[in-house]
Each structure stands twice: as C-alpha cells, then as structure tokens.
Amino acid sequence: MPCCSHRRCREDPGTSESQEMDPVAFDDVAVNFTQEEWALLDISQRKLYKEVMLETFRNLTSVGKSWKDQNIEYEYQNPRRNFRSLIEKKVNEIKDDSHCGETFTQVPDDRLNFQEKKASPEIKSCDSFVCGEVGLGNSSFNMNIRGDIGHKAYEYQEYGPKPCKCQQPKKAFRYHPSFRTPQRDHTGEKPYACKECGKTFISHSSIQRHVVMHSGDGPYKCKFCGKAFHCLSLYLIHERIHTGEKPYECKQCGKSFSYSATLRIHERTHTGEKPYECQQCGKAFHSPRCYRRHERIHTGEKAYQCKECGKAFTCPQYVRIHERTHSRKKPYECTQCGKALSSLTSFQTHIRMHSGERPYECKICGKGFCSANSFQRHEKTHSGEKPYKCKQCGKAFIHSSSLRYHERIHTGEKPYECKQCGKAFRSSSHLQLHGRTHTGEKPYECQECGKAFRSMKNLQSHERTQTHVRIHSGERPYKCKLCGKGFYCPKSLQRHEKTHTGEKLYECKQCGEAFSSSSSFRYHERTHTGEKPYKCKQCGKAFRAASVLRMHGRTHPEDKPYECKQ
C-alpha cells in the first residue's frame, strides 16, 4: 500500500517498494487565483495559465494517477477537448472507487509537501456540505478556480477513501477544510472584509492576496496609482483602468469593456437573461453583485459603515461614494463642462447628458434612459406593482426610495443639509438641485435654442413654452412618418404613433383595461385607489390630474403673471 494516505508520496506501480520523494510545496509551483480574479483574465491569459499548470502536473511526481496511459499534448491541443474535460474524466475514474460516509484522517492546515509524514491521529467525518461541487483540497494550491475553470486538481490522487460527502448526489471530497470555500459559492457568504476598502471575499487566502494591493508588497506595482499585485496578469488587467483600454466588444451594440466578465454581464441586458433569482421574492438579476445587494433589502443588513459619521450601507461601493462627501473628493471631471463627480457611474451618466446617448431601452415601450437605475425604475411602471407601503397612511410606492422620502413627510426629517447655507432637504436630489443655486451650474440644455437650466423640470417647462409659441405660429415640426400629421412637441408625436399600432402596453390589474401611455394608466389607477394628489392651494380641493387642477385654478380670481405676447 502507499507509504502515506495524505498525498505526501506515491508508490511506483512498477515496484513493490515506496519511493520517498524530495519535499515539494504546492506554494512553490502554483499560481493562486480567486474566482473573481480568474473571471478577469482574457482567453490568451487563461490558455497560458492552463499550459503552465499542465506542465506542472506532468512534472510533479506526487500525482497518484499515472499519466502514461494518456497523450497529454494531444488531449490538450485537440480543439474538441479542453483541460476541464480531461481532468473531470480523471475525477470520475477516481469517484467510482470511493465509498462515501467513511471516516478520514484530516490533513493539518499547513503547507502540503510530498515527503513521507505520519498521519495525523485526528479522525473526522463530514456530512454537512451542500454544494454540488468537488472540493479542491487543503493547500494554497487550492486556486479557487472551481467557478469558471472547474479544474479539480487534487482529484488526481488515488489514495484513501473520499468520505466527505456533499448532500447533493455523486459529490465526494477528501479533506474537510476545503469545504468551507465552495459552500460559500452557493450561499453567497463572504465573511472576510478588507479593512482598507471594504471589499469582501469568500476565503481567507483570497483576502490575503487582495491586501497585497494596499500594502504595496507585491512584485508588480502600478506606475499610475501605486497598487501592487502578486501576479503579472492581474497587474496588466488593472492597468486598463488607467489606460482606458477596452478589448472586449459587444457584438450587438458595439459597446466595449475592460474585462470579459463585465462584457458577459452586459450581454445579458440584450438577451434578458437574469440567472440570479431571489428565493424570497422571486426577483431576478443579471449579476451576482446586484443579487447580493438586493438580498440585503430583505435581511436589513448594512455591514459597511462610514468611519466619520457612522452611517451604514448595504455594499462597500456606497460607503466609498458616501465618504467622498466628507472629503469632498471628486476624481471624475467632465471635459466638456468641467463638472467633477464623486463616482464613475455618475460621471458616465453625466457624459450621456451631453452626448444624448441612452443605452438602456425599455423593451415594452421603447423609451431610452441614460442610466441603469433610471431604466430599472421605469420598468416597474409597466407592471403597476407597488410593493412598498407606508405604515402610517397606507400609500403604496413602486420604489423603496420613494417610500423613504414619503415617510419623511410624516416624521419631518430633513437629513440632507447644505454646507454653504445650512438649509436642509428631505432628499439628496433636492439638495443637489439647491446646490446649483450656489455654483451657478445649469446642466440641462435646450436642444433648440441652447438655453440652459438647473433642473430637468425647468427645461421641460421651457419646452412647453416653445410648444405654446408654435400653437400661435402654427408650426408643427414633428411629423408622423405613417400619416404625415404634424405635432408641436415630440411627446405628442410619440403618443400619436401608438394609435397606428394599436399598442396598449399598460394594463390595469384590477379591471383589465389597457392604455397606450403610462400617464393615462396612472390616471386610471386613481379611479380605483381614490387618490387625488393634486390639491388646490386656495380652497383645498383635490384632483386626480394636474390638468384638471389647472382648469379649476381659473375659477379663482388671482394674478396671472405669465402673459402671451401674441
């Protein structure tokens, strides 16, 4: 039998004597990747990595399964086979001989070397792991590559039974310590948080590798920001942040990305694929990050706290953005208008205001949006679902942020204070709008006359006055392509176009009546709810629509400061 049941040595199948090998640590020959890091590598980098590791497997005399019956070069070079399938074939051969449920000798949590060593007397068994994956073993050679690669490196070993059994069928493991990380792949648990930036990780080894970036101890140092990396490939990938290189292009829309993982997530916006589904409410998401962020809404968990004011957040990037309000750091500056922004997403959205680009298009009504947040908020208007209800007055809202804002009406809370004049506001958007009175910023520009405004509301009001002028002049520049009818404003044209298609995308869940526009749908909903949000300031009478309130206003004798010159 083999001289050791812990992969420290192997017995030559051609002799009856065991041959003791020189000590070899996996740390000395392996490159460590986390699952996140592996996702960032491009195809050529992964290929190089596989070739190096294949050569390493070939050279390590510790492997219990003989390779002489395989032509490794042929197996790898054959395009119909890949490295994963080759390893999984070996895994399945070994699994056939395993007997789940038996006990095993646990390997101590130290470096695995391949010299003869007495087995630890500690005997343990495991029946708690629920994952559906194969464990990689207990060593730094555990490259955390199970997600994208699936290389079950330690499964080449033949010694001993595999008693650690996954509760999902046909999955066996040699070492109990290797369970901890794969289990978190399924639960989404990331218990190791970086004290510097708040980023979380599945395993202790992953966070150790990450900390190198902050400590500056890695051999590959970024010349732009000083971050250090333990791996050349990760250093090269990081450089793209500074150089702006985006080698991964979407075939459908032409948009480019710095990372292949980001491209894959983006492609789901075209396909509509949302593989990450919430078990509590059934809502699905494009990316695991959005899914984990959503989960915290149910749990109420806010694990990331601002060191200055103690405010807590559901994810680390929100903390980083919030902390810039204390430091007033705004690293992203617009080259067109000079405005500086604190977050990259805000900066990208701002640039689209200049370019007019609206990459997020609603599949139901065709409306385009500058940001993903605006698009997601709009999507909910079609469903009519209002899951967020006020406990005090019973009013329901589509978005949790709208409910929070509404609740401040009851409490009188105004948490957003202007640092220049001390005035407080219920929402950050109102504070932002107020801030422009101090800075003089006017980001909303009329496409027809060039006049700029502080808010979108003011721009829309201005556009309505232009429409009013056209009513007198008779100008109708917006023509329907089907019937040639002209309109004063683009919104009127869009509403008209739906009369040709007969399309009625907004359906009332209570009575089944359908509407061609969201405004008509919202007005109709109020007939069921009895809601009358438009209130006359003079007599207190309330109305379902703003237009009805305006008509009512004419019944009161009052000043009319806006006079038509024509």
Swiss-Prot record:
InterPro entries associated with the record: KRAB, KRAB_dom_sf, Znf_C2H2_sf, Znf_C2H2_type
The keyword Nucleus is annotated on this UniProt entry: yes
SUPFAM superfamilies reported for this sequence: beta-beta-alpha zinc fingers, KRAB domain (Kruppel-associated box)
Pfam families assigned: KRAB (PF01352), zf-C2H2 (PF00096), zf-C2H2_4 (PF13894)
Disulphide linkage map: none
KRAB domain residues: 24-106
GO biological process: regulation of transcription by RNA polymerase II
Coarse class of the protein's main subcellular location: nucleus
Domain of life from the UniProt record: Eukaryota
Keywords from the UniProt entry: DNA-binding, Metal-binding, Nucleus, Repeat, Transcription, Transcription regulation, Zinc, Zinc-finger
Molecular functions per Gene Ontology: DNA-binding transcription factor activity, RNA polymerase II-specific; identical protein binding; RNA polymerase II transcription regulatory region sequence-specific DNA binding; zinc ion binding
Zinc finger region(s), C2H2-type: 164-186, 192-214, 220-242, 248-270, 276-298, 304-326, 332-354, 360-382, 388-410, 416-438, 444-472, 478-500, 506-528, 534-556
GO cellular component: a single term: nucleus
Keyword Phosphoprotein tagged: no
Localisation per UniProt entry: Nucleus
Function: May be involved in transcriptional regulation.
Stated family: Belongs to the krueppel C2H2-type zinc-finger protein family.
Listed name of the protein: Zinc finger protein 69
Organism: Homo sapiens
Record lineage: Eukaryota, Metazoa, Chordata, Craniata, Vertebrata
